């Protein structure tokens, strides 16, 4: 399709000379002095994209990406032509069919020839790197240069990327909580004594391990929660607090509390529950009775979250997932409460085919606006599942839980089948932390690429 521009202009001039000679002497024909790209678009692209098989093996699938939603901007001042919305990750742009509308004659710079060569307005072009175009006016007295870039995501926005760091030596994880840019990992040492490991969240974790003091013997570190930048836990039916996670002190008689079941700085409430009922506090030391303990209300193996409603940021939703029995057997319970309501609501429905998964060590965190459940081996929708095989995600605030089927949001393969204590949390920089122990223990930090983009 490419021809020497000189030949093209010579032919173009001869056409106009011929027209002039066959017309009356009073008729004049002028070649256009304009040179510009008026519109640009590309055709649909068929490419191979990463995916995975039903058994979890990596594979490729071929699909066609429609270009209708990817418009191009033509900046006539700078001469740049580009798409604001990048094409999907892994899209092949080595042979792209184009469609130009121009005033003038279009040419493209060819590196191997070190010159601009004529091109048709519907040629296919390699856009793996920006291409230089030049539009000559038909009278060959003027030209304008353009640079065309077809932007493609260099990383898959929806991919969850994991980094592995060394395990926290000598600590069996129970609960992980972030405060002021530091991660606090509560657990036990080899003798079963309570300890806390602390590390900065921004860099590779460098853990400092300290013995926990001030809590009664046998205190359940799984009850630790954060409220108004202070750590709280329940032990022997009472409430204890700590400003540094290391030294703890008595905060309030907890009316036989067995667990902290809700905490929200926005709503200004800390919730505890036990056989005597559910209580709330605004300062962590004075608790007010709210309601009697409902049947099947979870008190053990607690995971909780609190967040504003999408349609009204002034209303806080409390989510609570756990077990009503101390041995944490059977199906987990899912309860919720709005800050404007007076009672907690049980989400259990015997007809629900997508109930919360019953996993060993079940942990639930809120991530990317949804609830993520992970854990050891167990049952999901009545079927046996391996430990850490998948995320189970609820997009309707805890009612339906479905296996994450997307190729990109997967747990690290190294965790598959793991059967050791672990702790899970999400930090303020959108990283999910999974900390496990044992001979293959590690600290995993994962993030969906898109959430990392939003930080920049």
What name fits each language-model region?
Residues 415-456:
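Blade-level signature of beta-propeller repeat domains, shared across WD40, Kelch, NHL, RCC1
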Residues 165-191:
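Beta-strand-rich domains and repeat architectures in extracellular enzymes and scaffolds
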Residues 22-174:
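Predominantly extracytoplasmic/ectodomain segments of secreted and cell-surface proteins
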Residues 17-20:
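C-terminal motif of bacterial Sec signal peptides marking the signal peptidase cleavage site
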Residues 197-202, 241-243, 280-282, 337-338, ...:
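Conserved Ser/Thr-centered positions that define the repeating blades of beta-propeller domains
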Residues 140, 188-193, 277-279, 323-329, ...:
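Short glycine/acidic-enriched loop and turn motifs that connect beta-strands
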Residues 180-186, 228-233, 267-272, 312-321, ...:
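Entry beta-strands of beta-propeller and related beta-repeat scaffolds
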Residues 168-177, 213-228, 253-268, 294-313, ...:
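Repeated scaffold domains used in trafficking and secretory/extracellular systems
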